[in-house]
């Protein structure tokens, strides 16, 4: 996705709906209509607001950001790009040009939820999650919490776990403790 692509164009793109359902779901929660009509996908990421939806989704999807300076192009993983509140790994002479997101397949599970005072307000807390479906359950869990920390944060306990229905409550309890 090009960095200057408006939120509304991402939300209305058939390709996003088909191959990036996590983004398709979360983009509808971004701000209010005026912001979605004028704001850009890359702008949300470069701004690095810890309560914003797109940084969390980029981390959950293991996105790569393409940064361009006069002399070179650099690729940075989303998890390494966000350093803190509105602070990124972008150098002063660079601009964010492209966001590379791996397509989600029918074997990929995802979830997105945020809690805010009203629709369009900043998230008080939210979660973006991805996983791979296997016959035994879910693997490669990436559960990213946002809105309550300095930057989107991956739950290390969830990332190191596989999930079958019988141990879902146990994992949920461990993740809650990890994030406390």
Model-inferred region functions:
Residues 1-180:
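C-terminal structural segment of proteins
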